[in-house]
């Protein structure tokens, strides 16, 4: 965070987002996108560990920037010509963003301003929780998939609900749906030897998110 404090958070632009549709280049947009997530993670962790006022202030600025983005999904994962609600696309990174913000909301209750906490609840609910809960299962292609997308998206949504939703029937219904998707479909993608055909990197990515969700339920 000390290094990033001296840097300016890069801005996402419509021009960069459009590049994937125009020429197939997704890397320039993603470089900026993930740099912004680096700011979020760095100042979030610094705030959680050290609780310094300057880190909290910087984090609140970064959260405001993230919440002002037009779409949390990557440009390569949306279908603007087919889906009028493409800005609400829930992909790997959108679900991760929601989970990260929800976790910061829960762990920094006493440090974050009421305005920032309200912003987090509003945007994460609008972009992640409400669309998922309103859609009849399996509403997304990854919800009944046997690859890492299932565990990453489902796991992050489940953890987001744990941190943001009040205990009750609505929350339990969502968590039951998540557990069913992971246990019924994702785990079917593994062979008897515990391996998957996606490769080691994807195995770790999906399994890690499943384990994090399991731990968040404890």
Question: Locations of the language-model features?
Answer:
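Repeat-solenoid scaffold signature
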Residues: 201-218
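Internal amphipathic alpha-helical repeat/solenoid segments
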Residues: 14-32, 75-89, 138-145
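Alpha-helical solenoid scaffolds that mediate protein-protein interactions
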Residues: 46, 59-69, 73, 104, ...
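Active-site lining segments of carbohydrate-active enzymes
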Residues: 82-199, 212
């Amino acid at each position: 965070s000390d290094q990033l404090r001296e840097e300016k958070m890069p801005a996402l632009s419509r021009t960069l987002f459009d590049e994937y549709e125009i020429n197939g280049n997704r890397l320039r947009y993603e470089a900026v996108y993930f740099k912004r997530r680096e700011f979020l993670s760095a100042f979030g962790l610094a705030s959680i560990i050290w609780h310094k006022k300057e880190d909290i202030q910087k984090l609140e600025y970064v959260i405001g920037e993230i919440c002002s983005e037009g779409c949390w999904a990557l440009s390569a994962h949306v279908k603007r010509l087919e889906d009028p609600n493409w800005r609400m696309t829930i992909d790997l990174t959108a679900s991760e963003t929601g989970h990260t913000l929800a976790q910061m909301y829960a762990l920094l209750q006493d440090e974050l301003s009421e305005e920032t906490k309200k912003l987090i609840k509003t945007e994460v609910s609008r972009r992640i929780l409400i669309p998922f809960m309103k859609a009849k299962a399996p509403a997304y292609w990854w919800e009944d998939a046997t690859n890492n997308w299932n565990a990453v998206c489902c796991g992050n949504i489940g953890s987001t609900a744990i941190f943001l939703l009040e205990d009750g029937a609505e929350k339990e219904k969502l968590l039951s749906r998540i557990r069913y998707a992971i246990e019924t479909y994702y785990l079917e993608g593994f062979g008897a030897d515990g391996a998957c055909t996606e490769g080691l990197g994807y195995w770790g990515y999906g399994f890690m998110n499943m384990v994090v969700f399991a731990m968040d339920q404890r």
